[in-house]
């Protein structure tokens, strides 16, 4: 059942005139700064923040991840030539790293010379962990001066040592390590572009609080390792919920400049704890369901107005009320919102170029209801009758006919809960 709030005809004062419709379409397009060719995308630009911490040794991995990631690092001074070529031709940024004081400056120089688009140099890896870099602030300060000099020589932006909760006596707290390090007379915050941190806490709220701690340094934040691992998730669905909540936060957090998932593949089985692998083993390599979520996840690209007549995936939102909104994957690798429930809302940027009613693809085992708004104005309250089960996807045609041009379309759940798959005309 549809409860009209605003007549769809009122948006078209020139209804009935082909010339009027063309003028109206041109007016909307011109006002929104869109291309008059009506050639609008069906996907967003990939996220400039999204990356992985991973050593690409299998050529099959690159085309699966490169459409979604903008950068990567492998804890080393350089990467193999095959990966480097792929990075150069697919708008991906590789970041060399000085893992500890024993790095090879010559290897880094050679890599930067061969790949002049290299922009960043990563600092020491977890110096407050005894099984990693294992250095006190005072011990790190000496070799750090050489790293600073190398970054300046190569015109690279320098990223701080990457900190986690540690095992080094007296330095469990990464903030304590950083505070002492930056207070040393031969160390300066001015030498670094960003603060690097790692986090394996399985609670998304704990991750968000952890990120906030490092805002005190007034630098962009790079989360260069993260996944849910402490405590270990009981299944991959828990890892999916974690990923969605944390990515929803970091993509929208202006303090987070980059993040890198740990990691796309390990030596363990894909279906073994902590269930964080993005790629399968063997050949041909495929994305795991978690990998599908990671690569298709919204980049919150507010410049893209997706063609509504081509279908807008429910996961392609540009704003949302609740960061805990989670995604799942169908058998044909389509993402959908799981359990969209009362009190939650999601915004989409859509481009309309046909006078057709809005359709919603969904599944639900309870009767549900949503309010549809366009550009902040409620258009209709729509009843979503329950389907026979959550595997039965239903397409409901509403009476809402969006006006031509670019618009912000909001779905707000008023009652019930349902899985949402797609919006289209």
Please report, for each region that a protein language model flagged, where it lies by residue.
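Bacterial Sec-dependent N-terminal signal peptides
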Residues: 21, 27-46
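Structural preference for beta-strand elements that scaffold enzyme active sites
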Residues: 49-51, 70-71, 91-95, 119-122, ...
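N-terminal carbohydrate-binding/catalytic regions of secreted carbohydrate-active enzymes
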Residues: 49-119
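Aromatic-rich peripheral "rim/lid" segments of glycoside hydrolase catalytic domains that contact
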Residues: 95, 262-311
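Aromatic- and acid-rich polysaccharide-binding/catalytic face
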Residues: 96, 125, 177-212, 217-230, ...
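Active-site groove signature of glycoside hydrolases
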Residues: 115-137, 159-168, 190-199, 257-265
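Active-site clefts of carbohydrate-active enzymes
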Residues: 166-169, 217-243, 262-280
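Extracytoplasmic
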Residues: 302-425
């Amino acid at each position: 059942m549809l409860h009209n709030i605003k007549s769809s005809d009122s948006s078209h004062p020139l209804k009935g005139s082909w010339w009027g419709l063309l003028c109206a379409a041109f007016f909307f397009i011109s006002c929104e700064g869109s291309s008059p060719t009506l050639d609008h995308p069906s996907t967003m630009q990939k996220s400039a923040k999204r990356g992985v911490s991973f050593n690409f040794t299998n050529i099959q991995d690159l085309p699966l991840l490169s459409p979604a990631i903008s950068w990567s690092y492998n804890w080393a001074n350089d990467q193999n030539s095959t990966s480097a070529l792929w990075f150069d031709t697919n708008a991906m940024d590789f970041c060399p790293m000085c893992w500890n004081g024993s790095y090879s400056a010559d290897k880094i120089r050679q890599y930067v010379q061969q790949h002049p688009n290299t922009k960043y140099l990563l600092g020491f890896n977890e110096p407050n962990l005894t099984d990693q870099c294992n250095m006190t602030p005072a011990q790190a300060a000496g070799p750090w001066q050489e790293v600073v000099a190398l970054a300046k020589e190569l015109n690279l932006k320098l990223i701080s040592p990457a900190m986690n909760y540690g095992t080094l006596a007296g330095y469990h707290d990464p903030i304590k390590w950083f505070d002492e390090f930056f207070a040393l007379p031969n160390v300066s915050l001015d030498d670094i572009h960003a603060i690097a941190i790692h986090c394996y806490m399985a609670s998304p709220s704990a991750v968000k609080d952890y990120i906030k701690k490092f805002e005190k340094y007034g630098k962009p934040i790079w989360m260069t390792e993260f996944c849910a691992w402490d405590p270990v998730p009981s299944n991959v669905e828990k890892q999916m919920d974690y990923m969605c909540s944390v990515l929803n936060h970091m993509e929208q957090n202006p303090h987070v400049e980059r993040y890198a998932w740990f990691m796309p593949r390990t030596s363990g089985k894909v279906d073994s704890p902590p269930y964080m692998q993005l790629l399968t083993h063997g050949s041909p390599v495929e994305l795991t369901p978690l990998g599908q979520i990671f690569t298709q996840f919204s980049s919150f690209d507010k410049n893209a107005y997706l063609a509504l007549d081509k279908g807008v995936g429910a996961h392609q939102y540009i704003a949302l009320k609740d960061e805990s909104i989670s995604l799942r994957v169908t058998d044909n690798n389509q993402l959908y919102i799981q359990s969209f429930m009362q009190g939650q809302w999601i915004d989409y940027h859509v481009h309309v170029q046909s006078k057709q009613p809005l359709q919603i693809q969904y599944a639900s085992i309870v009767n549900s209801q949503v309010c549809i708004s366009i550009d902040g104005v409620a258009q209709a309250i729509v009843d979503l009758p329950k389907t026979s089960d959550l595997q039965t996807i239903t397409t409901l045609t509403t009476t809402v006919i969006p006006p031509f041009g670019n618009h912000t379309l909001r779905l707000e759940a008023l009652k019930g809960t349902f899985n949402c798959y797609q919006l289209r005309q």
